[in-house]
Design a protein with these regions (language model features):
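Non-transmembrane, aqueous-exposed alpha-helical and coiled segments at domain scale
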Residues: 1-334
């Protein structure tokens, strides 16, 4: 088995080195099993600084980014100014200096003070660490495996509602997080995609700013967050919590071509007497069950209330043990 970091990934050498060394310390040497696409773009130290500068400039209108430099890196990628992993093998110093100079000019125009001396030194050291891995044309490798009939499991990041095209724009990430992103992020044909598993929580969460029609601001929302340990994986920020939004879920099923749904974290709702599910939005007094062009604070969620199952689902060993109320909840969602 091998692992491949595809062309659609934005690779931060610093974070990569930290994770790889952590794995090595636990007895998992990945240098022989992990390949990296030459076409993956590199997150530069100045990308992180730009991320912070842009957020600071937005003031109260900030999006709430992770601060990892994702947006600025995608900006360079789309404007054809990016630095890629494969550039490590060809004129890297020249390409890096050109990108850095452009970033510094932008930062001067924003009057943003910064010092990347230490970060840059660590970043350059991490680049040397990166070179020990096999840098490949990943699209050829992956497609050859598919031709040989081997199984390929693709893993993306983030949910449908953070997709740059179909999410709650502008409070989204900078890439396509839907199923189709697998094709462009790995270089495989849509014909090679088999089953599409849609994984969702039994409730809704969101990190950072942006619209959230079913968000709960009371003790129920706090309880869901505490029981679900809802904190951002990257930033550690407390996630906003709310009831399940079936308007958004149906939209995600449609956009991704989901063939099977998988619900997780149902045990978080074990202790609730009743559970709500949003089945429609009320916009300007009119109900709709179609996800709209834009979501704002004026949207009212229309709920159906269902009885809770009041059972510890972590003790369940088979579907036959599911309580009647839980099965009713599943049937309603279906």
């Amino acid at each position: 088995k091998i692992n491949v970091i595809g062309n659609g990934v934005l690779l931060d050498p610093l974070l990569f080195k930290q994770e790889a060394e952590s794995l090595a310390a636990s007895g998992h040497d990945i240098t022989k099993q992990l390949y990296i696409s030459k076409k993956a773009h590199l997150i530069l130290p100045t990308h992180r600084i730009l991320d912070a500068a842009y957020e600071a400039a937005k003031g109260s209108g900030k999006i709430g980014t992770t601060g990892k430099g994702i947006g600025p890196t995608y900006t360079d990628k789309i404007s054809r100014n990016g630095v890629r992993v494969g550039d490590l093998l060809h004129n890297f110093e020249e390409k890096y200096a050109a990108a850095k100079a452009k970033h510094e000019a932008i930062l001067r125009s924003l009057n943003y003070e910064y010092d990347i001396t230490e970060m840059e030194a660590q970043w350059l050291e991490a680049l040397n660490y990166l070179k020990q891995f096999k840098l490949i044309d990943s699209e050829h490798v992956i497609n050859n495996y598919l031709k040989e009939g081997k199984s390929v499991l693709a893993e993306g990041a983030q949910g449908t509602m953070l997709d740059i095209d179909f999410g709650s724009y502008p409070f989204v990430t900078s890439s396509n997080t839907i199923c189709a992103g697998c094709c462009t992020g790995l270089g495989v044909s849509p014909r090679n995609i088999g089953e599409v598993y849609g994984i969702f929580k039994a409730y809704c969460t969101r990190v950072g700013s942006g619209p959230f029609p079913t968000e709960l601001f009371d003790e129920v929302g706090d309880k869901i967050g505490q029981l679900g340990h809802e904190f951002g994986a990257v930033t550690g920020r407390k996630r906003r919590c709310g009831w399940i939004d079936l308007v958004a879920l149906k939209y995600a099923v449609m956009i991704n071509g989901v063939s099977q749904l998988i619900m997780m974290k149902s045990d978080v709702l074990d202790t609730f007497d009743t559970i709500k599910a949003c089945v429609a939005y009320k916009m300007n007094g009119v109900e709709t069950n179609e996800f709209p062009y834009e979501i704002d604070d004026t949207i009212e969620p229309v709920y159906v209330e269902l009885p809770g199952w009041k059972t510890d689902m972590t003790k369940m060993q088979s579907e036959d043990e599911f309580p009647e109320e839980f099965n009713a909840y599943l049937s309603f969602l279906e």
